[in-house]
Amino acid sequence: MSAAADLEASTVLALGARGKHRGAPFTLAGRTCVQSDTGGLWNEWTLAFDDGRQAFLAETAAGFTLFFERPIAPAFEALTVGQPLASGFVVVERGQARRIARWGDVPESPRAYRYADLSSASGETATIDYGAGERSEVDVFVGRKVRLADLGLRPRAERRRFIAAPSGPTPKALELWLAVGDEGELATDGSRTRFRVIGITHRSIRIEGERYTWEEYVLHAPEAGVRWLVVSDGHWNLVESIEPALVEESERGARAFGELYKPWSSGRARLEWASGELPWTAAIGDVTETRDYVRAPWMLSCESTADELTWSRGTYTPPDVVARAFGKRLLPKPSGRAPNQPKIPKQR
């Protein structure tokens, strides 16, 4: 398949599809495929409402976010990742991107531009388009994550395409329990969703001189987006991204969802090996700063670089649950206790 065809297929939506938002009908009038300078790929859909309004729907690996324009725009040069703004938002990413393909009715805009993504504790997200240079017009859009069903849209049967993982031989000592292409049904967001394994990563970290390793199975579903099944020493966690502004760190730990999570570990995580497809461009040796906090059965994890900040929450998932979901006869027995493993009540 050609590169152009790959780009055209990197979506689960169709140009011209009709939907509704809060009772107002709209048409998916245009689509722009965008790539960041770090290789991340996403789609921006232009929503043309019948009443003349416009909005855009961001289709990313994490799901869908519906944006409407709103005026809040700090200077690009003044932004740093993790910085809280007077508007109540926190800067979670800044960088440069290129619009690499377009379809349908799309407003004229520079091919290359600078951008910043923001997060708020209220659940709103924002993206700022700073244009190509210092004197460019600045566009600000604020929105919330949505499900396609909320917009009266249905994903197409074919799955979107992601970015090929870096190639390399599989480490001899590495044992894999799921394979790219495996499918399983897991409970997420109060319902059961069928996911497909699209990629696998093997990572390591050194803490107080000791080297630890784990595997991350990247899962994808057209409606739900991306999740991860992370396994270390036979212990599994189902992980999903959360809005960074929902987390407040202090010396005592990290507070999120009304609960205090205790500090567990921090260090520099390194990518050792990968296979399949990933939602981002990866290279063997990539390093991120990590911090983990626990409150059983959950683990909060922060990963950051100079230009990006992400938070995720993992839920301890017994091996038999994973085995049943993916039709595996047997998964390895866990070794020791996981930091967020729930305690088993004593029998009286």
Predicted regions and their residues:
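Mixed-charge, low-complexity intrinsically disordered regions
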Residues: 1-348
